[in-house]
């Protein structure tokens, strides 16, 4: 029997076209077992290598919007093999989506060589902040874990229209900018803190509209700053620090570059201790968040002592000054009385079990009102209602992080600064060793949104959606581990919600597990 080369080529071409049609039809009608895809999956590319007997199928990002399991992946390959015409059904088949083989996206999958996704990367030193007045020290749960958590959007300045506005529409007498704060701040953050975690928020968390600054370079509200010498006196540190002034901040002003920092040698004996007293003058009694600041220098210690006196009660903290210098560091929220006395103050000592240096800078009481001027005006609202872009500037974040749009687009800047601020804090830690930063071991960032939408039938947007990003930076986090860890967490979070909420609310939709490139992820 004779067959010309042209006939062979024609036959092979027809088989390839048949394979492509069948695969396109299969994937277009594909529905995952758990959940749904927001749009039908589409095949972007089909490559068949007859010499190596390999079929490579590249899917679009919609196909990644599902939780892959061992059984679901096996089923996909089995179905694809049945769809392919002979001889392609005997070839090695590889299916890709978002730059990875689908079998590599199985939740809980291990990296090559049998190592778990996390490997041996872990932080085991002193936490950034620890309340040492607690009757017991946790050893499990989330102790020594540092998380970044924020609630949706916030008030921002519309550069094109020239006024401040909410990012999301009004709905049921509120909007997402306001509503999500009422879930994240009083419930979610405390739950994680009670489990042992230290939680950082790139948005102001304190709803208190009053704000009092006490600092060696000048204080607000006629508050009192006092240094008490011990064996050694407090001296000026060789770095810039916070400097307070009444009024608003302009575009690129950094309040942590216009003041000074004080420092002292550490001591162990009580008789040798020095103190710095921060005594605010409260115009009204109430609950105020307490933020401290300091500088991280050579010789900084992991257990700087801070004592918060609130209505005569005493709560002691250890702050790891080997990380996180040059910004506001949250200690807690306390009840304070009206006035200015020793029953309501913060005291920093130079007590430490380590030989080295204690530094101290400004202490802030209360969330306050927004003070970042844009377009000649401030928002006129409490800082906690503003977007993260404005808090970042008040917290000493460099201009390049909170103004990626060079001052022309506050909306875009607000979205970008949340993750960039987390990277700025976490750079140099075990989780972000390749970037420069404050060395805070942040191992998770999570944004919580209500999705702020509406639909004609009122049902399509009800339910839960999780978003992660795996196809970025060659599929790796800065620590070198696979970004699949993010998808594993997103899937676990979504599964937990779908386990818990239906128990209370009966019908609850699992919307999507999106693997997309969002700035926040």
Question: What are these model-derived regions, one by one?
Answer:
Residues 150, 387-483, 513-521:
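Active-site microenvironments of hydrolase-like enzyme catalytic domains
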Residues 256-282:
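Short beta-strands within extracellular/lumenal beta-sheet-rich domains
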Residues 311-341:
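Extracellular carbohydrate recognition and processing domains
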Residues 346-357:
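Short beta-strand-plus-loop segments that form exposed binding edges in beta-rich domains
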